[in-house]
Amino acid sequence: TNVLFSLSKRDKKINKYFGLDFPNKVGVAGGLDKNANYFHVLGKLGFGFVEVGTITLKPQSGNPKPRIHRFSNEETIINSLGFNNVGSVKALENIERNKKNFSGILGVSIGKGKEISNERAHEDYLHLLDYFKDVADYYAINISSPNTNDLRLSLIHISEPTRQSL
């Protein structure tokens, strides 16, 4: 049963966005379940949607540790995880194994591999969009990694080919 959220019961209002019927408005963003190991459990806790990842085409170990830095004087924490994940093949296996136990909306956060140039990033994204097409209800294209040089600039190379593929 849903133990955390009273919102876990279907809202009386219709929560239909972009053709998807969300059970409720409370979800989990990418980063918590990087490898799609327990998204189905998060659904049982009452989340109406869960985003897994960020997932890259090939497995990545992420940045060297320590990856999380606390600055007490500024009351801040900075993460520089580096998209550590098991890669698309294993992540898809995990999703396929657990999706039958999940009734919410499943998002897949995708990112370019660190060995791929920004000019070729669209190739990774297009492959990942195609690879997860049968299991993802929506995608989040993660271009926010602050420790990947000029990743946001790769949006120029990503946007048109990605839009054309959809």
Question: What residue ranges belong to the model's regions?
Answer:
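An N-cap/entry alpha-helix motif that binds or orients negatively charged groups
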Residues: 1-15, 76-84, 88
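N-terminal amphipathic alpha-helix/helix-capping segment at the start of soluble metabolic enzymes
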Residues: 6-27, 92-96, 102
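Active-site mouth loops of central-metabolism enzymes
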Residues: 22-34, 110-124
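Hydrophobic faces of well-ordered beta-strands that scaffold small-molecule active sites
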Residues: 26-30, 50-52, 106-110, 139-142
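Active-site cofactor/substrate anionic-group-binding motifs, chiefly glycine-
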Residues: 42-57
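Glycine-rich, proline-tolerant flexible connector loops at the mouths of alpha/beta enzymes
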Residues: 54-65, 140-154
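A gly/proline- and charged-residue-enriched helix-loop-helix capping module
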Residues: 58-102
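Single conserved hydrophobic/aromatic residue that forms the stacking wall/gate
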Residues: 156-166
